[in-house]
Amino acid sequence: MFLLTAHVVFATITGNNEDVADIVTEKLEDLGCQVTETEISQTDAAEFQQANICVVCAYTYDEGSLPDEGLDFYEDLQALDLHGKTFGVAGSGDTFYGEFYNTTVDHFEAAFKLTGAQQGATSVKINLEPDQAAIDELDDFASQLVAHAQAKR
């Protein structure tokens, strides 16, 4: 049987997006994937070329800004050719920011689409720390990513 590989990249200030990444990683592993989880400033976007499933879990800073430590990653991601890959984006934010709530999720989704990768699950936006409902949503997100990647095999 073919082993799916996944790479989960996160950016966090409060720890919430690392929690999001950990939840996704754990579910992917439970589903039989070989998973690498890394922090965005320590990751070269080109590492996604080695994975079947590519995931970003990142925060939105202030009024809609991408994480400073993830700007190079974001720019490099857009230049990659990820045809044949499955991607997903999730993030924790704060609804206090209104129209800017979790906009980084939207930016990374758009960046992935430029690479030719296929979206394997609807992006997930979590308010603050993941509660049980959010964990269930993230588990479903991970399951959808695996199902999408398996269907492409």
Language model regions located:
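Short, surface-exposed acidic/glycine-rich loop or hinge patches that mediate macromolecular interfaces
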Residues: A11-G15, Q42, T60
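Short, flexible active-site loop motifs that bind/organize anionic cofactors or intermediates
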Residues: H7, T38, L128
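A short beta-strand-loop structural module common to alpha/beta enzyme folds
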Residues: Q34-T43
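FMN-binding flavodoxin-like domain, especially the glycine-rich phosphate-binding loop
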Residues: N16-D19, K27-L31, Q50-R153
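N-terminal amphipathic/basic-hydrophobic helices that include classical n-h-c signal peptides
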Residues: M1-F2
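N-terminal beta1-alpha1 ligand-phosphate binding loop
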Residues: T5-V24
